[in-house]
């Protein structure tokens, strides 16, 4: 049997929990529409980016949802045009269905805002601005439930749901023009009433998720992972305070979601310190890094931490830091997800500026960067087989094999081994 494959087991297979490697691809349809030219690592044209991501080893994708996006964001309280704020419910239904149809897991990121929601801004949707706190909570419940029902009907039922984006300081503070006590921020030092208002809102969001998508995992997402760059987070005190408040309020959730951008959050050891704390205090929760990224070229605007002596801004540097993050995360059994933010950005073949330099494609060449391969090593679809032997010679090929080791030219229905990973062909 000349095509019989004998597997060289170079790693131990373990029955660990499912791990997810993926990215937030919320802008992919825009780049496809703009005619972006995507290429593999070795320069072959990519006709379907989602298929390419899956073949590389990604098994989950994240998409953000705004309430009523108008391609606008705020800068110092003033509204400005933002091409990237376009993900309404119809957008997410279409992209979510594409993800599900590929056999990948779908993470939905509710922003509960008309524009970007992060620690610097969490604006209440304009249409909800006049509601009192009780009415706002009820609106949040009905909106969440209806959005999920529509996604299910469209074939885009989420497997994981973020009830808010980077909500370290709460959400739906009010309007950009509000000031003082009218802004319902939830800093560690904020009034207890602000925190009560916030947790009451969260309870309605999570209630709707459990009712409409009972099998989905609920994620609470924050970005207080740095002790050196975030002044209120010495010894991870702000991070600890947030999840303590969630526990005291009996918020129903499954996964702790973290952001980690080394150029904002500092060394890898700072992320690991946050994970260690969470593992000790919240052993019943899984942890995911739902946003991660690092440049392959120049510094990202607003960078506060220079890591370039260890990880230069280059393809090799981006690859190295990704590999080291994956290695660290794999040491922690409670960590089950790693998602690259905006991996699909690619100006090649378009009239886009190419300003963003931390995706997983090089805008100058359109080629996938080396970091993509490293990121995908976090996923748990690996068979534990890192290499194969044919007639005593190690091989690295793109062929498909049955579980008994038989090479097949055209895989049909069933489970196969491809690039050392199990792959289901439907």
Enumerate the language-model features and the residues they cover.
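Boundary/entry segment of secreted carbohydrate-active catalytic domains
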Residues: 18-52
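Hydrophobic faces of well-ordered beta-strands that scaffold small-molecule active sites
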Residues: 20-25, 59-63, 106-110, 159-163, ...
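Substrate-binding cleft and catalytic face of glycoside hydrolase catalytic domains
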Residues: 51-194, 199-225
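C-terminal tail/sorting-segment detector
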Residues: 415-426
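Glycoside hydrolase catalytic-domain groove-lining segments
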Residues: 46-50, 196, 211-218, 225, ...
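Sec-dependent N-terminal signal peptides
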Residues: 3-13
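Residue-level detector of functionally pivotal "anchor" positions at catalytic/ligand-binding pockets or at interdomain
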Residues: 381-404
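Aromatic-rich peripheral "rim/lid" segments of glycoside hydrolase catalytic domains that contact
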Residues: 38, 180-181, 273, 277-284, ...
